[in-house]
Regions:
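Ribosome large-subunit tunnel/peptidyl-transferase-proximal elements
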Residues: 1-95, 116-126
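Short, solvent-exposed loop/turn elements at beta->coil junctions and helix N-caps
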Residues: 107-112
Length: 126
């Protein structure tokens, strides 16, 4: 007979490691962060999302460098508004035409007052 209790991330019972929120909420938060990064070119986040955020932001720049209609539609599917898509293809992507990857950097920025969470500044490399 299976044990009763909360399921952890891997589907097993017991509270070993619980997900903070669902996969859909996680992806939506990531999309919002990458949209803000494209618009403002520099954002401050907690350390948990940095790796995925950098990966997705680098992929968006790669799509912008391609510049065709299919790449624009793929970027529009991820980014939250048309302003971000336009800025990605017209301003950001041309700056990196001679660079092969590594478009973002992460700089540790101390801890947040209140919950002591590690803050990280994510920005595009100029």
């Amino acid at each position: 007979m299976a044990a009763q209790g909360r399921k952890n991330v891997h589907g097993k019972t017991g509270v070993r490691f619980k997900a903070a929120y669902t996969k859909q909420k996680h992806e939506n938060k990531l999309r919002t962060l990458v949209t803000d990064l494209v618009i403002h070119e520099r954002i401050t986040v907690t350390s948990g999302m940095v790796k995925e955020l950098k990966s997705l932001a680098d992929h968006m720049i790669t799509l912008g460098k391609r510049g065709d209609l299919h790449a624009r539609r793929q970027a529009a599917a991820v980014l939250r508004n048309g302003e971000a898509v336009t800025k990605l293809f017209s301003e950001l992507a041309p700056e990196y035409k001679d660079r092969n990857g590594g478009y973002t950097r992460a700089i540790k920025a101390g801890v947040r007052l209140g919950d002591n969470a590690q803050k990280v500044i994510v920005e595009f490399v100029k």
